[in-house]
Every structure is written in C-alpha cells, then in structure tokens.
C-alpha cells in the first residue's frame, strides 16, 4: 500500500480530471486526456511577459514585474507588480505597493501588513483577509476579514464581513448568500501594454 505522503494532487487544465502524482514530479500527463501539466514552481525576479500555466506556486519578488495575458497556478505570492488575469487554485497573497491590473480568482485572498495596493479589476475569492490598505472591488463566497490595520476602499460583496477595531471599509457592503455571488460581472481582459 502506498502512503499519501509520497503523492500530491494534480488537476488537468484541459479536462479538469483530478489525479495523484509523485511528490517530486516536475510535470505530468493527464491520465484522462493526455495533456501536459507543469508542476514546477515559478519565481519572477525581473520583467517577464510570458503567460504562466502551472500547478506549482508562483512567487513575484519585489523587483519582479509580470505583464502577461494570464497566470494559472496553485498559490501566488506577489511582492512586485503583476498585470495579468490570475486564477489560483489556492491562496493569492499580496505584499506590494502600486496598482494590479487584471482579475484575481482564488480560494483565499490575503493582503498582508505593509501593502498599499489598488486592484483595477475585481477580486473573486472564497475567503478574504485584509491587513493593509486595499482599493478595489471584492466578491467573496465566504467571509471577509478586515484586520486592525486593514482598510478597503471599494465595494465588498460577501457572505459575511468582520471589521476588527481600527479597520475600515469605505464603500458599499453587500451581504448575500453564497450562490448569488457567482452572478458577478463578467471578466474584462486587461489592456495590452
């Protein structure tokens, strides 16, 4: 019997088939449709214009700048600048200053302490945590937490919103049931630079 610790989960970008692959694998082929799937982590230290499609993690360093049509990954950690539509199967964490162009779709969305970031397109997440200044529109099918140093300047549509003492919400707050949030506005592609 094989132990679970030697395997990791993977999902095909093309057909959506979920399967297990070796923990140290850098790539895999989907057993259902045969499509190639990258499992490697990507780190951006300088300017890049390549679209990213991996089931690994993406790290954008402080001096990194990503201008691409799309980013598909497991977890995203951004300390630099990103101009792309982002789809994460896990967390999207931001600790940067400046403007982010492109829609963000993820499970957990976090703006860490020290950030001051403006999202020019909407953010769609299951769980949202804001510990710094954020400008933009948030759609969450779960809770939104605004920490004591957190501030959201923009509209929030969520299942629940919690604001710790010292936190701010400057905009409309819509509390709805989870299924209604899926009817948010359609995606608008970012302008090509």
Question: Which residues make up each language-model segment?
Answer:
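Long, polar low-complexity repeats
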Residues: 107-136, 142-144
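Intrinsically disordered, glycine/charged-rich N-terminal periplasmic/extracytoplasmic linker segments
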Residues: 90, 96, 102-105, 130, ...
């Amino acid at each position: 019997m094989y132990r679970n610790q030697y395997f990791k989960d993977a999902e095909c970008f093309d057909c959506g088939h979920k399967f297990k692959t070796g923990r140290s694998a850098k790539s895999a082929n989907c057993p259902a449709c045969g499509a190639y799937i990258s499992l490697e982590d990507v780190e951006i230290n300088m300017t890049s214009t390549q679209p990213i499609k991996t089931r690994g993690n993406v790290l954008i360093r402080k001096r990194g700048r990503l201008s691409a049509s799309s980013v598909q990954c497991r977890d995203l950690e951004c300390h630099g600048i990103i101009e792309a539509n982002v789809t994460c199967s896990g967390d999207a964490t931001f600790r940067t200053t400046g403007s982010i162009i492109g829609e963000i779709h993820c499970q957990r969305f976090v703006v860490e302490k020290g950030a001051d970031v403006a999202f020019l397109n909407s953010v769609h997440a299951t769980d949202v945590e804001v510990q710094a200044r954020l400008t933009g529109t948030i759609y969450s099918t779960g809770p939104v937490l605004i920490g004591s140093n957190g501030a959201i300047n923009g509209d929030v549509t969520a299942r629940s919103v919690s604001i710790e003492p010292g936190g701010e919400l400057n905009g409309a707050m819509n509390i709805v049931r989870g299924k209604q949030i899926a009817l948010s506005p359609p995606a608008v592609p970012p302008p090509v630079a």
